[in-house]
Swiss-Prot record:
InterPro entries: ApaG_domain, ApaG_sf, Uncharacterised_ApaG
Biological process per Gene Ontology, one example term: error-free translesion synthesis
Protein name as annotated: Protein ApaG
UniProt xrefs under Pfam families: DUF525 (PF04379)
Matching PROSITE patterns: APAG
The organism's place on the tree of life at top rank: Bacteria
Naturally occurring in which organism (per UniProt): Azorhizobium caulinodans (strain ATCC 43989 / DSM 5975 / JCM 20966 / LMG 6465 / NBRC 14845 / NCIMB 13405 / ORS 571)
Domain ApaG positions: 3-127
Length: 130
């Protein structure tokens, strides 16, 4: 579990390797990740957009931008939470994801919230150290 808090918005990321959707011999690996967003502040906020940076073990970087998450732009009142699960494929058995959400406060202010960097690793993979 990976967690970051920005301006009283807490984001927790929990990745999980999905073996049944992966074909390691073909260079296809798939992870599901669950994100929980909690409003610890005193003002309602809306998640308006996302920006992901996905890096594989070869250093190949893919950036993903889009409105909301999983087709929604959730509103979180004070104390409110929103959770969703999505997925990401990689051609390598390890990688890392990070990013941010653009939020709109009920006051009209916009701000970015960090999504903590989280590791994408095939479980039980032998590690080679140089």
């Amino acid at each position: 579990m990976y967690r970051a808090t920005t301006r009283k918005i807490q984001v927790t990321a929990t990745p999980r390797y999905v073996a049944e959707r992966s074909e390691p011999d073909q260079g296809r690996h798939f992870w599901a990740y669950t994100i929980e967003v909690v409003n610890l502040g005193k003002v309602s906020v809306q998640l308006k957009s996302r920006h992901w940076v996905i890096t594989d073990a070869h250093g190949h970087v893919e950036e993903v931008h889009g409105a909301g998450v999983v087709g929604e732009e959730p509103v979180l009142p004070p104390g409110g939470r929103f959770e969703y699960t999505s997925g990401v494929p990689l051609s390598t058995p390890t990688g890392i994801m990070s990013g941010h959400y653009d939020m709109l406060a009920e006051t009209g202010e916009t701000f970015s919230v960090e999504v903590p960097a989280f590791s994408l690793d095939v479980p039980h993979m032998a590690r080679i150290l140089n």
